[in-house]
Design a protein with these regions (language model features):
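ABC ATPase "signature
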Residues: 213-214
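Helix-to-loop junction immediately C-terminal to a conserved catalytic motif
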Residues: 50
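Catalytic Walker B motif of ABC-type/P-loop ATPase nucleotide-binding domains
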Residues: 154-158
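Conserved ABC ATPase "signature" region
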Residues: 96, 100, 107-125
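Conserved ABC transporter NBD signature motif
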Residues: 58-74
Length: 246
């Protein structure tokens, strides 16, 4: 089942165009990576999927509903690039606050909080103020917040930036488990190519344009190279040449 469909989306701010005809889909139980350097348009795409902004052209559909749509808010879990947490509250109080935004009974809230705290391994720190957390602990709490309402679609903007390799590995193990066991659809932005290898499908973006899409292995086969950095460079070069001709 198609959970997300981005259909020929362009975005401009005044005369400054950010995105050109971006198109891709994500199926249920799939991790899709948006791959590209800083400033390529990844976060703008995320905002359009979330309904935080409108496309200048094209449409975004989540679960067969056009975005923005208030009824979709409970269906999307979002982890921003910078942690949107209340520093003076404890981890537990943060989770209770975010859980209260969704129509859950007290019992459901407690069940979900216990589940996500265990999931991100924060049991020993959950009653401490977030201001005392390390960067990695804050990222883990942000992931817990994104999962609190048990959404079918997870959108994670650079989820492992600034955390140690061991924690990064554990987060990716958890994302893979969520995909396989709970059939979550997960959209991840990253510029780290070894993380890109863990995705089912990749959407490579350069200067606001999709330069190529496909599974990591298919892309390496299609471009006859051994790693994704080479795919990006080769696809980017071909796209640039095509733009110059047209």
């Amino acid at each position: 089942m198609s959970v997300l469909h981005v259909n020929n989306v362009s975005k401009s701010y005044g005369k400054h165009q950010i995105l050109w005809n971006v198109q891709f889909s994500a199926q249920q139980g799939q991790i899709v990576g948006l791959i590209g350097p800083s400033g390529s348009g990844k976060t703008t795409i995320i905002k359009l999927i979330m309904g935080m902004d409108y496309p200048s052209a094209g449409t975004v559909e989540v679960l067969q509903k056009q975005v923005p749509n208030l009824s979709l808010l409970k269906q999307i879990g979002y982890m921003a690039q910078s942690d949107a947490l209340y520093q003076d509250l404890t981890g537990y109080e943060n989770l209770t606050f975010f859980a209260s935004m969704f129509l859950m009974t007290k019992e459901e809230q407690q069940e979900r909080i216990a589940y996500v705290v265990n999931l991100v391994q924060l049991e020993s720190a959950i009653k401490k103020r977030v201001a005392t957390y390390s960067g990695g602990m804050k990222r883990r709490l942000s992931l817990a917040v994104a999962l609190i309402q048990n959404p079918p679609l997870l959108i994670l903007d650079e989820p492992t930036v600034g955390i140690d390799p061991e924690l990064r590995k554990s987060i990716w193990q958890e994302l893979t488990r969520l995909k396989n066991e709970e059939q979550k659809t997960i959209i991840v932005t990253t510029h780290v190519m070894d993380e890109a290898e863990k995705c089912d499908d990749l959407v490579m973006i350069r200067e606001g344009r999709v330069i190529t899409t496909g599974s990591p292995q298919k892309l390496k086969d299609d471009y006859q190279v051994t790693n994704l950095e080479e795919v990006f460079l080769k696809a980017g070069g071909e796209a640039h040449a095509h733009q110059s001709i047209s």
